[in-house]
A protein has these predicted regions:
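Membrane-embedded alpha-helical bundles that constitute the cytochrome b-like, heme-associated redox core
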Residues: 1-138
Length: 138
């Protein structure tokens, strides 16, 4: 065997572009959403079992690790949605130049963060929606 052959560098040497990281993250969020849906089905089963299991579920959802997983699921959902919209744009044959790919990757990250923030705001502070409604009626 020839030992003078060049070795391929390890993955730590490569600096993936943002679009590559987004693509990998899209696949990871797809798997996470599948696991999250199993958790949601389990929660629905607990809800259907009666008041005692519902109280247990409420108590469990008060712990910060459970909230962190819940918030992560919401972010993964919106990230996956935004990347899906990006794929629809690509299916239309648009936005294939390098600059636009980078630009849309940043937009995708910002949109998913904004949608997550707005969802959490409406979940934890529903009066915010009422305040917006009052402001726009004036």
């Amino acid at each position: 065997m020839n030992s003078n052959r060049p070795l391929s560098p390890h993955l730590q040497v490569y600096k993936l572009p943002l679009t590559g990281l987004i693509s990998i993250t899209h696949r990871i969020t797809g798997v996470a959403l599948s696991a999250g849906l199993l958790c949601i089905v389990y929660m629905l089963v607990m809800l259907s079992l009666g008041a005692e299991s519902y109280a247990t579920l409420q108590q469990f959802m008060q712990y910060w690790p459970a909230k962190l997983v819940y918030w992560g699921f919401i972010y993964a959902l919106f990230f996956h949605l935004c990347h899906g919209v990006r794929h629809l744009i690509w299916d239309a044959g648009k936005s294939f130049d390098k600059h636009t790919l980078q630009q849309y990757a940043v937009y995708e990250l910002l949109a998913s963060l904004l949608l997550t923030f707005m969802t959490l705001l409406l979940l934890y502070k529903p009066e915010f929606l009422w305040m917006l409604d009052q402001r726009f009626q004036k």
